[in-house]
Swiss-Prot record:
Protein name as it appears in the record: U3 small nucleolar ribonucleoprotein protein IMP4
Lineage of producing organism: Eukaryota, Metazoa, Chordata, Craniata, Vertebrata
Function: Component of the 60-80S U3 small nucleolar ribonucleoprotein (U3 snoRNP). Required for the early cleavages during pre-18S ribosomal RNA processing. Part of the small subunit (SSU) processome, first precursor of the small eukaryotic ribosomal subunit. During the assembly of the SSU processome in the nucleolus, many ribosome biogenesis factors, an RNA chaperone and ribosomal proteins associate with the nascent pre-rRNA and work in concert to generate RNA folding, modifications, rearrangements and cleavage as well as targeted degradation of pre-ribosomal RNA by the RNA exosome.
Pfam families: Brix (PF04427)
SUPFAM superfamilies: Class II aaRS ABD-related (SSF52954)
Length: 291
């Protein structure tokens, strides 16, 4: 079983590496094509291979390129089968972290919560794979305040690491009543860059396909690389107006890393993207939107 998993993982990484090489080659061809069409100078770094690239352009067509990619491998059952989400915490969780994990369980339809106990990460991931879990969520804390969220897609990855801030739990708001467990409609706003679409896919595939008459709405709104999570239900007051009611919890997410492996492969998996906060231009740059 372990050898089979290792082989499947190697095959997936090989496909991913080939796709990345093909994408880079296609970008170089596109730069040469645009320079020729617009009668501009060819970029300096491409001048040595410009003739070879121009020759290969003759054989390019719309064809089937780009129809499938590694995202299709990772989320091939998205929309066909409902995701199976497992939520757990770091070791020795405080009462507030347990409370937050319970509230996250209400956010994701069909999710299950598992007490961490003294289980190691490798044992957790193996148990999740054996039981058909598609996503493992781990919540971390600092002195009773939730500060981190890890989303690991199974069986091959990716794994996204987020910082949590400005957390307001349902338990902190009086007289909220019971939360709806209907399959929610999703609003994804501000994810216009390539990395933004990647993060949008990681988050939206945690939810099943909603029914048309669902009154529940979950929003992930990106602004300056901070993703605001909001949870509402709505009702129609008349044929023109809709009344929104926030049911919580609410928090902000800040992405700081995406790894290509699962959670237990932290030491060996390749890093797809990492935030570098200590560079001179870090405070000026945004990554999740193209604006």
């Amino acid at each position: 079983m372990l050898r089979r998993e290792a082989r499947l993982r190697r095959e997936y990484l090989y496909r991913k590496a080939r796709e990345e090489a093909e994408r880079t080659a296609q970008e170089r061809k596109d730069k040469v094509r645009r320079a020729l069409e617009e009668n501009r100078l060819i970029p300096t770094e491409l001048r040595r291979e410009a003739l070879a690239l121009q020759g290969s352009l003759e054989f390019d067509d719309a064809g089937g390129e780009g129809v499938t990619n590694h995202v299709d491998d990772e989320y091939r059952w998205a929309g066909v089968e409902d995701p199976k989400v497992m939520i757990t915490t770091s070791r020795d969780p405080s009462s507030r972290l347990k409370m937050f994990a319970k509230e996250l369980k209400l956010v994701f339809p069909g999710a299950q919560r598992m007490n961490r106990g003294r289980h190691e990460v490798g044992a957790l991931v193996r148990a999740c794979k054996a039981n058909g879990v598609t996503d493992l969520l781990v919540v971390h804390e600092h002195r009773g305040t939730p500060v981190g969220l890890i989303v690991s897609h199974l069986p091959f990855g990716p794994t996204a690491y987020f910082t949590l801030c400005n957390v307001v739990m349902r338990h902190d708001i009086p007289d909220l009543g019971t939360a709806s467990e209907a399959k929610p409609h999703l609003i994804m706003h501000g994810f216009s860059s390539r990395l933004g679409k990647r993060v949008s896919d990681i988050l939206r595939y945690l939810f099943p396909v909603p029914k048309d008459d669902s009154r529940r709405v979950i929003t992930f709104a990106n602004q300056d690389d901070y993703i605001s999570f909001r949870h509402h239900v709505y009702k129609k007051t008349n044929h023109r107006n809709v009344e929104l009611t926030e049911v919580g919890p609410r928090f902000e997410l800040k992405l700081y890393m995406i790894r290509l492996g699962t959670l237990e492969q932290e030491a060996t998996a390749d890093v797809e993207w990492r935030w570098h906060p200590y560079t001179n231009t870090a405070h000026k740059r945004v990554f999740l939107s193209a604006e």
